Amino acid sequence: VDPYWMIPHFEKMLYDNAQLLGVYAQAAVATGEPLFRRVTAETAEWLLRDLRSPEGGFYSTLDADSEGHEGKFYVWTPDEVRDLLDVEQYEPFAQRFGLDRDANFEGQWHLHTFKSIADIATDLRLDEATVETRIDEARARLLEVRNQRVWPGRDEKILTSWNGMTIGGLARASRALERDDLAGAAVQAMHFLRARCWKDGRLLAVHTDGESRFPAYLDDYAMLAWGLLELLEARWDADALAWAVELVDVMLEHFTDHEAGGFYFTADDHESLILRPKTFSDDATPAGNGVAARVLIRLGYLLGETRYIDAAEATLRAAHAAIERYPHGHGTLLMALEEFTSPPWILVLRGESDELDVWRSEVDKLYDPHRMIVAVPSDAKNLPAALASKKALGGAVAYVCRGMTCSPPVPTLAQLVRELRGQ
């Protein structure tokens, strides 16, 4: 990018957008800012429209180039846009996105936000709602025309770890936007990975050209497990919980460094390497050890499994020196450390599905990144003991837990909201 963050590298990556989807969804809930809500919705729509395979998995990238030129798919000229729009649409659009200024990318215009809606409304003597409507109509028209251009190449590898992040991002967006279809897309991606990338109790890392291959790495197990936990917060799914447990147990059995703590990048039965790598720092994606620790903490407290908490502690102890030396590079492990030292709130709702939907919707409006919420229908079967012990008592009830200690059941939504606001 340039110093002004105006011109991007035009390649679009699944892992970037999956993470941003979750971040904007959280920001929308935390702030109530309409812009964040809009970006969440538009990012989700883009993922579903441009990167989802017919079977429900998600492809890896859209290239930067088309027809041999970087960014050609995305740039415009004022004359092109003027020919496509009504006069009343063009003027606010041009001011908003710089078509009334000099070209900003190789003699053409990459659409960049230059002027606020409020300033445009003042300049054109219109109300802000009218300006927004006209700009939205213009964007829709340009998207329609852009889709008729020669598309950038698409890398149609489906990577397990990146799809795990996408499941998590879609689940968060589902909650923030109250759109169950996004949770449905996350479930479909889960089913795709289970059908195509899970064989004999182990994950495969890549699906491409109709085949799945390569033994999965730590990141695949950890990020998919994290995505499944996020999905459980958006929609009760017994299969998601059971698979998360399976993934974590494989991770503990085959990736653990039993001497120093933490997890190796490769399994103990992976092809022999001169050195088995074990990394703690974040890169373009979160560190596998950091994600694993966060999964172990949350799943451990949800299910009352102290061995998961112990494994998370061993990981944090193993990473301590690296975190202390360069904390900025270990954000994921720092988030895990925060939840290890101050356990997350685990909120278990029990009752009929329709009533649970109302309770969860209200609770989701109370932003708390350190709270995990699971709404378990009263007719759910074969529950783990820690969830089965939390009974549905006629109507909906809530169990508020911190660490391994839970409150008596909270019998009304109003009381629950009061208690959560007081935390």
Spans of features found by a protein language model:
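Glycan-recognition and catalytic cores of secretory/periplasmic carbohydrate-active enzymes
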Residues: 1-423
